[in-house]
């Protein structure tokens, strides 16, 4: 139960509550510079967080075989089962013991952290579409505040307030409260702040509060992924005080923090952004941003050419900027246009390597597009929620505010790059590849209005499990098979936890899907309801295990990584076609729901897959799906809608329409 609720808290992206009532303000504390003033220091719990457990090898093998069962025929399953037995008693046992020993020697981190960073940073595929997702903000409830200049100014100020609050250790620690009446109180916070940090987690645990890992937060700002041959580098320069702004492919910088570390006045930021928006320069012939969409080794070589061509200092300004603000010159037409714009755009007005891009369209539609190597969205989601809350509830300017009378032509620096013929050729080649890839991507969206979380909970069913069941039914209806499915689950309850995989395709979802899709007339509504209940119970178990670090994917990944690192012949288990198949995730899924979130999306993780972003709200279910040319996203969504209609019919005791 605890794990399930924890998962709802961070993986589902519930809105972060307001900061605790402040301590008496000390001299020099300026409230307008900060989002909140937490009684408990931001990183108070970090030292005492529990360590990510390494599952028992026998549990991992059992879970792995359970996940393989719906994907394999009897002959394939017997072969995989035999390989698992050999692995468990042979080389797998040795590797597991080595992993446990290594973990005991590295108590400052988790067993997955290093290998997971390596996995991302050694990947040579472009970051855009292959790794970077986006989350879009809901519009400001006050429509006049959705003006592009107004919203860009307010969101920028709120973002810098977050930065200052985080670095001053004044941001509320990320904690999930099972009993907020006891733990989310001033009384408890005043007590726990005096408990030494190496014991503080235990103090919170005693009142059913669960602090979460916040180690990824320091990479939010002033950070960029730098392309390097073979393995990229994560770069952070927290001394830099300037913002990077992209518009029409041009690069601009100006300081958002003064020399004393105070936020530049909102009216000055407004003036500088207005100045940038009024720049009528034509788009550059060779937009540099395309290079961040390239294969990482090609980009590394071209970046070296940029550096040796006299652009090192200018590139340094891009890399060290607090973040990248992208101002687009067009309004958003609909959800599909929004998804294409925020997931990839036209390639000219994003710096895909930046820890995050804050994108604001002409009509004020806003989104965060983020690079994935540095973190898993835990920090991004907290930042996202806080920026939305602050910019809508305590905006720095109003639509009537006048920009400061300041000389923006001096304060704003336009960055110019010296491009050799080789670099121009490289940019043109990158554009060609980017355009071709984007052209092959389709995105479509549905909103199922018949019901959502409230109805499903009344039926005592997990809303997430029912959404996942709908995807299984839809794929079976469309393509006639059950395939490898991935749902991400945060393990932020542990020090340096990353993610674990929930495997939603199970023998229960397969049985239930076949009943609904292939022979619904054979079963009564009651029998179908019982099948759905079994799916829900099992999905809850998988979710609970994953959140507690008790999945199988990360453990097997770490064992495989260890074998490769130590030059050991790759165990047969990892050469089994079934292992490759279960890691070829045709259905890759992720869910978010928050008062701040409008919609999110990512591209398929394999060429013949679907990328499924979904949200189960109180009274509706939204689903945003991406696909390349070998799959039909529109048809898949029609099948999802049919699945949901059938499920709701069964839950209401009606016959399933064939």
Swiss-Prot record:
**Residues annotated as binding CoA:** 452-464
Which reactions fall under this protein's catalytic activity? (R)-carnitine + hexadecanoyl-CoA = O-hexadecanoyl-(R)-carnitine + CoA; octanoyl-CoA + (R)-carnitine = O-octanoyl-(R)-carnitine + CoA; decanoyl-CoA + (R)-carnitine = O-decanoyl-(R)-carnitine + CoA; dodecanoyl-CoA + (R)-carnitine = O-dodecanoyl-R-carnitine + CoA
* Record pathway: Lipid metabolism; fatty acid beta-oxidation
InterPro entries listed in its UniProt record? Carn_acyl_trans, Carn_acyl_trans_N, CAT-like_dom_sf, Cho/carn_acyl_trans, Cho/carn_acyl_trans_2
The intramembrane ranges come out as 179-208
In which compartments does the protein localize? Mitochondrion inner membrane
Q: Which residues carry this modification: N6-acetyllysine?
A: 79, 239, 418, 510
Positions that bind (R)-carnitine: 486, 488, 499
Q: Which UniProt keywords apply?
A: Acetylation, Acyltransferase, Fatty acid metabolism, Lipid metabolism, Membrane, Mitochondrion, Mitochondrion inner membrane, Transferase, Transit peptide, Transport
What ranges does the Mitochondrial matrix topological domain annotation cover?
26-178, 209-658
Tell me the active site: 372 (proton acceptor)
**Which family is this protein grouped under?**
Belongs to the carnitine/choline acetyltransferase family.
Q: What is this protein called?
A: Carnitine O-palmitoyltransferase 2, mitochondrial
């Amino acid at each position: 139960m605890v794990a399930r609720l924890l998962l709802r808290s961070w993986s589902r992206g519930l809105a972060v509550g307001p900061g605790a009532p402040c301590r008496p303000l000390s001299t020099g504390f300026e409230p307008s510079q900060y989002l909140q003033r937490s009684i408990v220091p931001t990183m108070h719990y970090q030292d005492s967080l529990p360590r990510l457990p390494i599952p028992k090898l026998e549990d991992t093998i059992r879970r792995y075989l359970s996940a393989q069962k719906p994907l394999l025929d009897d002959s394939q399953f017997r072969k995989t089962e035999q390989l698992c037995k050999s692995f468990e008693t042979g080389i797998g046992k040795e590797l597991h013991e080595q992993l446990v020993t290594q973990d005991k020697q590295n108590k400052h981190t988790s067993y997955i952290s290093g290998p997971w960073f390596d996995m991302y940073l050694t990947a040579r595929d472009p970051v855009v579409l292959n790794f970077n997702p986006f989350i879009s903000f809901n519009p400001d409830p006050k429509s006049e505040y959705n003006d592009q200049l107004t919203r860009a100014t307010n969101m920028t100020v709120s973002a810098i307030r977050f930065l200052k609050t985080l670095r001053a250790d004044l941001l509320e620690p990320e904690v999930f409260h099972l009993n907020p009446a006891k733990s989310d109180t001033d009384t408890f916070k005043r007590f726990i702040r005096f408990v030494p940090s190496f014991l503080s987690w235990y103090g919170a645990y005693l009142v059913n509060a669960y602090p979460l890992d916040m180690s990824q937060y320091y990479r939010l700002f002033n950070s960029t992924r730098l392309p390097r041959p073979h393995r990229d580098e994560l770069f952070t320069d927290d001394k830099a005080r300037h913002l990077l702004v992209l518009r029409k492919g041009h690069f601009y910088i100006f300081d958002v923090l003064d020399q004393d570390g105070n936020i530049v006045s909102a009216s000055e930021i407004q003036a500088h952004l207005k100045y940038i928006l009024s720049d009528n320069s034509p788009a550059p012939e060779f937009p540099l941003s395309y290079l961040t969409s390239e294969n990482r080794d090609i980009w590394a070589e071209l970046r070296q050419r940029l550096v040796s061509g006299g652009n090192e200092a200018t590139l340094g300004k891009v890399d060290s900027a607090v973040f990248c603000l992208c101002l687009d010159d067009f309004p958003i037409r609909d959800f599909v246009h929004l998804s294409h714009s925020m997931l990839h755009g036209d390639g000219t007005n994003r710096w895909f390597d930046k820890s995050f891009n804050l994108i604001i369209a002409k009509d004020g539609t806003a989104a965060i597009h983020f690079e994935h190597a540095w973190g898993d969205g835990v920090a991004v989601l907290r930042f996202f929620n806080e920026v939305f809350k602050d910019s809508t509830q305590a905006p720095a300017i109003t639509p009537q505010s006048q920009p400061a009378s300041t000389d923006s032509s001096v304060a704003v620096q336009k960055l110019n790059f010296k491009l050799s013929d080789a670099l121009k050729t490289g940019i043109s080649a990158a554009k060609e590849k980017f355009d071709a890839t984007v052209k092959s991507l389709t995105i479509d969206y549905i909103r199922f209005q018949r019901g959502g979380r409230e109805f499903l909970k009344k039926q005592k069913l997990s809303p997430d499990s029912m959404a996942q069941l709908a995807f299984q039914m839809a794929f079976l209806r469309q393509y006639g098979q059950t395939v490898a499915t991935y749902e991400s689950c945060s393990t932020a309850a542990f020090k340096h936890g990353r993610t674990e995989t929930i495997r939603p395709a199970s023998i229960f979802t397969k049985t239930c899907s076949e009943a609904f899709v292939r022979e619904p007339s054979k079963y009564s509504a009651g029998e179908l309801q019982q099948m759905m209940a079994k799916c829900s119970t099992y999905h809850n178990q998988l979710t609970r295990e994953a959140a507690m670090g008790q999945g199988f994917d990360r453990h097997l990944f770490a064992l495989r990584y260890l074998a490769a690192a130590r030059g050991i012949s790759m165990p047969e288990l990892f050469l089994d076609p079934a292992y490759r198949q279960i890691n070829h995730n045709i259905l890759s899924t992720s869910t978010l729901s928050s008062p701040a979130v409008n919609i999110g999306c990512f591209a398929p993780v394999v060429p013949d897959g679907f990328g499924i972003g979904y949200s189960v709200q109180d009274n509706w279910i939204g689903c945003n799906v991406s696909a390349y040319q070998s799959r039909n996203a529109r048809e898949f969504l029609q099948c999802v809608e049919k699945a949901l209609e059938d499920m709701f019919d069964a839950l209401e005791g009606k016959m399933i329409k064939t």
